[in-house]
Amino acid sequence: MKVDVLLGLQWGDEGKGKVVDVLTPKYDVVARFQGGPNAGHTLEFEGQKYVLRSIPSGIFQGNKVNIIGNGVVLDPALFKAEAEALEASGHPLKERLHISKKAHLILPTHRILDAAYEAAKGDAKVGTTGKGIGPTYTDKVSRSGVRVGDSLHNFDQKYAAAKARHEQILKSLNYEYDLAELEKAWLEGIEYLKQFHFVDSEHEVNNLLKDGKSVLCEGAQGTMLDIDFGSYPFVTSSNTVCAGACTGLGVAPNRIGEVYGIFKAYCTRVGAGPFPTELFDETGDKMCTLGHEFGSVTGRKRRCGWIDLVALKYSVMINGVTKLIMMKSDVLDTFETIKACVAYKVNGEEIDYFPYDITEGVEPVYAELPGWQTDMTKMQSEDEFPEEFNAYLTFLEEQLGVQIKIVSVGPDRAQTIERYTEE
């Protein structure tokens, strides 16, 4: 068996949570491979809305095995709150959720360091979510992090050493903080965390594959936030691309099967950083309002713009995407004209590739297509699609070179239409 990978192709917030929930009936296992509680996956079904930050989206599907891999960073306090809320709503976790011993822990002082570093940068700040993700990955790379498995052996000593080191840094930054409340909730989270199955996820995933089980790897954020390939330095601290599934779960590259790439019919971004197609007019405001574009974790208003096919082609290439999934098509239902960025103009020169140094000065070159101006939210099959919408799909497929297999026409899991079903 091979593992299939599901990931975002833009700047995050593409709708991965809903898609995982739609796809999971086909899989035995759902595994998160990177990121932390800075990104929320939103799912809606049966009139209920759920936001998952650390727990895999397969948790709503029967007896699936859900794995938090070694590439994930975990905040015990936030994990406890998330898990308890799920259990209270009738979704038991303890027998179905396995956590890698090698996953790194976000310490209370990591969150304070995150705020201190952002404050020190002034106008050059990245716009982090303040959840301590960057400092945690920094400790991981510098070989001084505290891992989930450490909670079982000499934990007090390891935690105290990391805390003391962080407090020295905070002292040098002259940053005032109050650790007591954060630490209290965090230590309670550690005790709660110990109630779950700690595993060597690399062995577990490979043994499941050997036993013929199907595995879906769930990414967080999006390709354009990847630490290596995103719009650096306005990126996250982990590899959000397909290769991150290998390092974040311990599976070999030749075990990768299908790669599902998710994108919105338009484009959004949260926080600072270049965004070539960003709209500052009524059109952008309309996208934001109709798409309810506010961060599921931070509540921050998302920046909105037309779809960027230069960046999207780049993402498809890097990830080896085999199937595309388009989200939030319904948000564009009332637009008379649809625009798509097909090239950039940089210093007067037109380019069709994503450059090394993408700056705020990049000017988008647009193709224009007629809007479908039809309410698609109640449609059940692609046979009902308006002619103009089909033309938009065809245009995107020609530009990207990959079929769009799934189209979302609303937030509920039922508002999902599969295409090419005869194949």
Feature map (PLM): residue ranges:
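Non-transmembrane, aqueous-exposed alpha-helical and coiled segments at domain scale
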Residues: M1-E423
